[in-house]
Amino acid sequence: MADNQTTAAEPTNGRVTRVQGSVIDVEFPVGHLPDIYNALKVTIVNTSAKEEGEAKETEITLEVEQHLGDSTVRCVALKPTDGLVRGASVSDTGAPISVPVGDVTKGHVFDVSGNILNKKPDETITVSERWPIHRNPPAFDQLESKTQMFETGIKVIDLLTPYVQGGKIGLFGGAGVGKTVLIQEMIQRVAQNHGGVSVFAGVGERTREGNDLIGEMAEAGVLEKTALVFGQMDEQPGTRLRVPLTALTMAEYFRDVQNQDVLLFIDNIFRFTQAGSEVSTLLGRMPSAVGYQPNLADEMGSLQERITSTRGHSITSLQAIYVPADDYTDPAPATTFAHLDATTELSRDIASKGIYPAVDPLSSTSRILDPRYVGQAHYDCANRVKAILQRNKELQDIIALIGIDELGEEDKTTVNRARKIEQFLGQNFYVAEKFTGRPGSYVPADETIEAFTRICDGVYDDVPEQAFSGIGGIDDLEEKWHNMQKELGA
């Protein structure tokens, strides 16, 4: 594994020889060429600053991407280069971009370079340690060889699309179907039930959404358990390309030094690929399939291989994925899918029924939904639930034409059980308590399997559908049914 600390070489100064947008060429003395990925610093003088207090100088960071001969490097700027001129002095830091790590990151919002964006005026922050964002993945002999299920306590996930400890999960869903709430809930559950910490990387999405997320997380009480790194769509492509690495470096510290289980969110992983394509084009590389960068698989692999379990502790990653034009064969999502252990698809149809989390049980998948990993009982129960839901889906067109009363007895039973299963797959979230007025619930996987097995066996055929909505486990179901009977009796 790479060293935790990178020792900076003796700083060397160069000068700017070419400025073309965010691509900068810098000439250095012979024998003092900076390494690839080194961070360079250059100061831009703001000659138009007229008002009192307006910044006269701005320092920007450049990252070395290519060597051009013996004395010139080609760099990508991480901030706008307006005002940068040829001949400007550039300082080589002698090391890659390094960011703060440790408890100081919790409750704070960072940019790609590790600068704190939400520091209060009276707040004193002491950064005791910084790690470089370019690091090697864990060595093979340090990896956790055992595949374990990551229990979330969310019924639909644990039963039908179980997450892998230290695995990568793809999260699909349009606007307004509950992606943000699911992300907040997972952050809450990791802190509450796994004693872990969460890191969020906002990559190339809308600034408004990032601002809303921070506000909602503060309101839900999960901000203090989370480190956030943002490089939104108004940022330079070099910034958007490196934001996931900054967040991942912070997550690696919690895993490797503090021995914690970490949940890493990346929203949106497609924007990481898109930024890589922009940088590749700016550097003049020959494009590959559909105009993407030729090193697409290598770039994606270098990020994903660092997201893994080491002996005893893990980084589990939840990655929102945008699929261009719903084309799953596009190289960007196709390259991402190769690394995923599970997919969770949020459905607008299910959300419209008022069932949350609105996970589509038939479209969502997991590689560990296999008797070798989850056990025979779990596997059989999940398959029975899916079979009932699939049959119900097939019967919907017939029901729309002739009505449910015209179905055979077996199909009627299937439809009734499917409706109960759909309602029971919903669940109250801790972070939504103040909006719903109902307490959140954690349902152990064993209890989830037992409950759905009973529904499939017909144990609850006499219990009305309404009793299954907005509850947690078996005890909640029986208590709600008991209260409904008392009300009916009264």
From Swiss-Prot:
InterPro entries: AAA+_ATPase, ATP-synt_VA_C, ATP_synth_F1_bsu, ATPase_alpha/beta_chains, ATPase_F1/V1/A1_a/bsu_N, ATPase_F1/V1/A1_a/bsu_N_sf, ATPase_F1/V1/A1_a/bsu_nucl-bd, ATPase_F1/V1_b/a_C. Keywords: ATP synthesis, ATP-binding, Cell membrane, CF(1), Hydrogen ion transport, Ion transport, Membrane, Nucleotide-binding, Translocase, Transport. Its EC number is 7.1.2.2. ATP binds at G173, G174, A175, G176, V177, G178, K179, T180. One of its GO terms (cellular component) is proton-transporting ATP synthase complex. It is a peripheral membrane protein. CDD domains: ATP-synt_F1_beta_C, ATP-synt_F1_beta_N, F1-ATPase_beta_CD. GO terms for molecular function: ATP binding; ATP hydrolysis activity; proton-transporting ATP synthase activity, rotational mechanism. It is found in: Cell membrane. The keyword Chloroplast does not apply. The keyword Metal-binding does not apply. It catalyses: ATP + H2O + 4 H(+)(in) = ADP + phosphate + 5 H(+)(out). F-type ATPases have 2 components, CF(1) - the catalytic core - and CF(0) - the membrane proton channel. CF(1) has five subunits: alpha(3), beta(3), gamma(1), delta(1), epsilon(1). CF(0) has three main subunits: a(1), b(2) and c(9-12). The alpha and beta chains form an alternating ring which encloses part of the gamma chain. CF(1) is attached to CF(0) by a central stalk formed by the gamma and epsilon chains, while a peripheral stalk is formed by the delta and b chains. NCBIfam families: atpD. Belongs to the ATPase alpha/beta chains family. Produces ATP from ADP in the presence of a proton gradient across the membrane. The catalytic sites are hosted primarily by the beta subunits. This is ATP synthase subunit beta. It comes from Bifidobacterium longum (strain NCC 2705). The gene is atpD.
